[in-house]
């Protein structure tokens, strides 16, 4: 069981200009005292073909963490356009919001981002050289993809098992009956909109989601290049990990501090 659970993420300024800062309102719950801070990061995927163009937009140390439900604002700079291939400035890409404890990542939230010109004229007849000031970004906040990772927290008892438990009865199961059953079940859950997200939640602010524990994946990443065009509403392909929900307005503890750099002290947040 995770000591820290992500409850909700609200993309605050969306849509926005490409050059505007990213603002996220993040709500999470801490079940017990932690000895170290949480480190949040936002990464911009600059290319769908190579991670050499990935940019870490900002990182933030949050702590000490009071037990209970906490909320804070994460602000990150826009990407450096000089580090993005010119032919991939426009179109759909991905941003990844991650959190780690003691260098071990335990949750990742990915969003599709559509970058396009503000005017129909530029959309229909784009200039050879992109005009950055005229580009607008739109984060598909209602369709995030959430991935959880089991990690060791402060105690050895919290560490995930190094090896899977022995299953001697597994050899007695007929291979032809069981082979591929898990893969088929997983494909069925992905095809089900109720499982894969995408449902609008009435009465919630735009871009707000609630992260449900049973909707999170226990294993690694999801390749967005295999997502269908229907899920993007015709907006293209990209890489990353992206799931769905709504937000809750919950107060945070009064002892938590936020550092805008891993080696610096930050400001205290009020309850």
UniProtKB/Swiss-Prot annotation:
GO molecular-function terms, A-Z: acetyltransferase activator activity; histone binding
Annotated Acidic residues bias: 168-185, 211-258
Chief place where the protein resides: nucleus
Region entry Disordered, spans: 152-271
GO biological process, one term: silent mating-type cassette heterochromatin formation
UniProt keyword annotations, A-Z: Chaperone, Chromatin regulator, Nucleus, Transcription, Transcription regulation
Complex formation: Interacts with histone H3 and histone H4.
Name assigned to this protein: Histone chaperone asf-1
Source organism (scientific name): Neurospora crassa (strain ATCC 24698 / 74-OR23-1A / CBS 708.71 / DSM 1257 / FGSC 987)
Organismal lineage: Eukaryota, Fungi, Dikarya, Ascomycota, Pezizomycotina
